[in-house]
Amino acid sequence: MKSLIIVNPADCIGCRTCEVACVVAHPSEQELNADVFLPRLKVQRLDSISAPVMCHQCENAPCVGACPVGALTMGEQVVQTNSARCIGCQSCVSACPFGMITIQSLPGDTRQQIVKCDLCEQREEGPACVESCPTQALQLLTERELRRVRQQRIVASGENPL
């Protein structure tokens, strides 16, 4: 069953710990320094509200269809990347409705690297951003759990869902 990261902006304090944890969780893909800091999520701020934004792992991901060389594919849990196939055309960047894909060249390397959330598939503990958030503003939920949370919020708000 597909899992998703949900964010509660009311709990986010904008500390960017999630961004740092993300970079640390992907050390083989970049050097850890201020010049090359490539988190796969970005904390967005609007007035007094902040919230991390990341790939939504769309079911019919427009980025997958936009890539002319198949560097992005649909996996069971996430939109998967294959940077070895990437030609740097940035079609996927343009196609992403959330602006959450970056194409990056690392210093001293001519290859292109696709940078997007992969739900930290390589980590047994799950996404580093979820684990590191000091206020638990991020949660990893299955689609079933997400439906349950949505129903609870509707009931709590007293809204008529119809």
From Swiss-Prot:
Positions of [4Fe-4S] cluster 4 binding: C67, C86, C89, C92
Binding site for [4Fe-4S] cluster 3: C55, C58, C63, C96
Keywords (A to Z) from UniProt: 4Fe-4S, Electron transport, Iron, Iron-sulfur, Metal-binding, Repeat, Transport
InterPro entries reported in the protein's UniProt record: 4Fe4S_Fe-S-bd (IPR017896), 4Fe4S_Fe_S_CS (IPR017900), RnfB_subfamily (IPR050294)
Domain 4Fe-4S ferredoxin-type stretches: 3-32, 45-77, 77-106, 110-143
Molecular-function annotations in GO: 4 iron, 4 sulfur cluster binding; metal ion binding
CDD domains with a match to the protein in the record: HycB_like (cd10554)
PROSITE patterns, per the entry: 4FE4S_FER_1 (PS00198), 4FE4S_FER_2 (PS51379)
Listed name of the protein: Putative electron transport protein YgfS
